[in-house]
Amino acid sequence: MVFAAPIVAAFFYKPTKFNNYGDIYQPARPVANLQMQGANGPVELDSLRHQWVFLAVADGVCNADCEGNILKTRQLRFMQNNDMSRIRSVFIHTNLAPDLAADLAAKYTPVEVYAVEADAYKKWTEILEIPDAPTEAQYDRFYIIDPAGNLMMSYPPSADPNLMKKDIKRLLKASQI
């Protein structure tokens, strides 16, 4: 009886609070393929699989929160030290002026900058929505896509990079992909 008690307790225990800082998408959402245009020609989003993807997105304009997220994708990747090679930093946009996109790519190297057609972008970003969140909380977020191509976490623009780093360290340690 004493030996069975922990097993029975674990079966009925349902935690309501987790140790993560970001918003987890449960279940993880498969990310659809997306045709993108990079500086070196067309690229498919599926080609980014098999690595973690830190993602920032913008529709039309890249405001201060957008640029902050691009910077976070780069900085958080660098913060991972030896695990940096397991991560790609990506910025997907639509309707940005080509010279602005090129400036962002140069300013935030090695972040990969890709343009997407407006209709495809609008349909594709439906997956990014967070249920029951206010409208303003839906945009200008920092997203994490796992190596299997699933959207699994996001952070608001005001997120503390040090707390984000802890989440990411845990993810990378647990996945070993």
Each model region followed by its residue ranges:
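Thiol-/selenol-based redox modules, centered on thioredoxin-like
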Residues: 138-177
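Short active-site neighborhood of thiol/selenol oxidoreductases, capturing the structured segment around
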Residues: 46-69, 73
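Short, ordered coil/turn segments that flank beta-strands lining enzyme active or ligand-binding pockets
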Residues: 39, 50, 147
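Structural microenvironment flanking redox-active thiols in thiol-disulfide oxidoreductases
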Residues: 64, 68-109
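Short, internal strand/loop/helix patches
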Residues: 101-139
